[in-house]
C-alpha cells in the first residue's frame, strides 16, 4: 500500500493538469495542523507543482525545536537554496525574513546539492525561536528559490489562533 501511495503522490506532483492542479485551477488547501485553538493551512502558489508539508505537534507555544516533514520533486538543481518569508496581519507587514538554507560552502541539510528530478524528503527538527503565537489571523508567504531565483516551492499560508 505504501508503494501505491508514493506512486499516486509522485503522479500528482509530476502531472498536475491530470490531477486537477494545472490548467488554471488552484492547488488544494492543505492542513498543516489543527489543534487547541490553532489552525495552520497552506496552498501552493507555484502553478506547476504542489508539495507536502506537516508539523508533528501543533501548539500555540512554538518550541525552539519543532519536527517537520517536507516533500517535493525538484524542477531545478539545488546548488544554493534560500527561504523568504513574509508575515502579514490585517493587511500590514509584520515580518520579512530571508534565510540561506543551502550555501555552496556551507550545506546545512542532506538535500543540499540535489539535482533536477530528484526528490527531497526531510523529516526532522527545525531550529526556531521559542514564542507564543498571539491571537489573530495571519497570512504568510513562503518562497524557496535557487541562486538563479528559480522557484523550488511557494506557499500561501494562513495561521488562525484563538
UniProtKB/Swiss-Prot annotation:
Induction of expression: In monocytes, down-regulated by the cell-wall fraction of Mycobacterium bovis (BCG-CWS).
The reply on keyword Signal is yes
Tissues where the protein occurs: Highly expressed in B-cells, monocytes and tonsil.
Q: Which GO terms describe its biological process?
A: inflammatory response; innate immune response; lipopolysaccharide-mediated signaling pathway; positive regulation of lipopolysaccharide-mediated signaling pathway
Cellular localisation = Secreted, Extracellular space
Instruction: Quote the CDD domains the UniProt record gives.
Output: MD-1_MD-2
TM helices/strands, residue ranges: none
Q: Which residues are glycosylated?
A: 96, 156
Q: Which GO terms describe its cellular component?
A: extracellular region
Cysteine disulfide links: 33-58, 45-154, 102-112
Protein name (Swiss-Prot/TrEMBL): Lymphocyte antigen 86
Keyword 4Fe-4S belongs to the record: no
On subunit structure and binding partners, the annotation says:
M-shaped tetramer of two CD180-LY86 heterodimers.
Q: Which gene encodes it?
A: LY86
Function summary:
May cooperate with CD180 and TLR4 to mediate the innate immune response to bacterial lipopolysaccharide (LPS) and cytokine production. Important for efficient CD180 cell surface expression.
Name the PANTHER family for this protein: LYMPHOCYTE ANTIGEN 86
- Its predominant location is secreted
Q: Which residues form the signal peptide?
A: 1-20
- Xref: InterPro entries: Ig_E-set, LY86, ML_dom
